[in-house]
Design a protein with these regions (language model features):
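Hydrophobic alpha-helical segments within soluble ligand-binding/sensing domains
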Residues: 113-144, 155, 159, 181-190, ...
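N-terminal helix-turn-helix DNA-binding module of bacterial transcription factors
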Residues: 1-25
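Short beta-strand elements in bilobed, periplasmic/extracellular small-molecule ligand-binding domains
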Residues: 53-65, 141-144, 158-185
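Short, solvent-exposed amphipathic alpha-helices that sit
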Residues: 41-55, 126-129, 149-168, 183, ...
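Periplasmic-binding protein-like
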Residues: 31-32, 76, 80-92, 141-146, ...
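Venus flytrap/periplasmic-binding-protein-like
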Residues: 166, 206, 217-234
Length: 234
């Protein structure tokens, strides 16, 4: 044992310890690559996974791609080739075809081909339920508030609006260049300035809904008395 530690000491001093010492980390390690950790949606998802995995004796490493396909590919390459990760989880990864790999890859959301397991997140049933609720309540003017990264939810909104309501609803759609509460505030303001508000709004996520509600409150428009709002976060 003394000789072993002396060899390790010399190896460290010469900067070659890691080159020859390749011990396996004792815990099962999961690498998670997600678009961001700043938003409430992704941060809650990351922490929920962390709690469940740690309860099972696993460790979770979290990386963010900042919605960049190139960055996501770089992080995937690192975990696959240069780390001792046991499983890689991709959250809402850009549509891609994975190269052959040895580390198991689980894709959650997104169109990822060649993943070892794929989990599809289907929020359209909840969206349809919300729109049907509005229709049964006698509401007809339904709008949508989103931002640049919620185009898939906008597309789902349009599909379901055409199927349930039909008619002209484009005038009630407002997509902001800003994100989170500022985005919701700006999108609601843009609708207000058009001079015609919808009876109800679907917001792409809850922070947008909060921003929209703040704008309406500041301008004397009560929620839900004058306008109904539903946020579709998770």
């Amino acid at each position: 044992e003394q000789t072993r530690e002396e060899i390790f000491r010399v190896a460290r001093e010469n900067g070659c310890f890691k080159k020859f010492f390749n011990a396996k980390y004792p815990k099962f390690t999961v690498a998670l690559i997600c678009p961001e950790v700043h938003s409430q949606h992704y941060s809650e998802l990351c922490f929920a996974l962390q709690r469940r995995l740690q309860a099972g004796g696993c460790e979770l490493c979290i990386s963010s791609s900042n919605f960049s396909a190139e960055a996501a590919a770089d992080r995937l390459d690192y975990y696959e080739k240069y780390s001792s990760t046991d499983v890689i989880i991709l959250i809402d990864a850009p549509d891609t075809v994975l190269a052959p790999h040895e580390t198991p890859i689980v894709a959650v959301g997104g169109e990822v081909k060649n993943a070892d397991a794929v989990i599809t997140l289907d929020y359209e049933p909840a969206l349809r339920e919300a729109l049907l609720y509005f229709k049964k309540s006698g509401l007809s003017g339904i709008g949508f508030i989103g931002e640049a990264r919620t185009v898939s939810k906008l597309a789902a909104f349009k599909r379901n609006m055409n199927g349930i309501f039909g008619g002209d609803f484009e005038k009630y759609i407002s997509v902001s260049e800003l994100r989170f509460e500022k985005g919701g505030y700006a999108a609601a303001k843009a609708l207000y300035q058009r001079g015609s508000l919808p009876d109800a709004l679907i917001c792409a996520y809850d922070d947008l809904a909060l921003g929209a509600m703040r704008f309406f409150y500041e301008n004397g428009i009560s929620v839900p008395e004058k306008i109904k709002i539903i946020g579709m976060d998770n």
